[in-house]
Amino acid sequence: KKGFSSKEIQKQLGLKRYEPVWAMVHKLRKAMGNRDARYTLEGMIEFDEGYFTVESSEIEQEKGIRGRGAVGKMNTAIMAESTILEDIETGKKSNQCRYFKAKVLTDHTSEQINETIKESISEKSILFSDKSTSYIDIADFVEIHITEKSNKETTTETLRWVHIAISNAKRNFLGNYHKIKGKYLQLYLNEFVYKLNRRYF
């Protein structure tokens, strides 16, 4: 289930040309995304955003934008089904995760967040997020929207699984791919999430 770069696949297959391998792999990633797009997440959902490093042009580097929308960074919505379980003997609570979704965002507006929620999450869900101003309308699209101030506890407990997914995706991309262009980031996320959702298969 480990990812392979197109170069590595070309090498293992003993093919002379790189381009056909690259095109084939991207078609597979697109198919993975189409398959996972057939269903929506339901139940208790963690929602947050992560910024992924992508290749930037020399012109973009010269502009040197910082913060949100920074050069070389792309914003992505990460969603995870998360169920709270309580140990009968100790009373200790823990979160168990099931399925994930990831979608590249072109901006940080509430309109795009709302659209992502509508197409990715069941209306009967309970959604947990931080208190970003972009999330003010989420309650209109789910059963209950619970917000918490963004801090270390939120990252490690309330939104634990989305942050684990973000961290693992970044590590996966860094270890397997030299550079990812922004326009292809969604395809790489498709592959990562597809495999993550089938980790027990």
Model region roles, listed by residue range:
Residues 1-201:
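Residue-level recognition of single "structural anchor" positions
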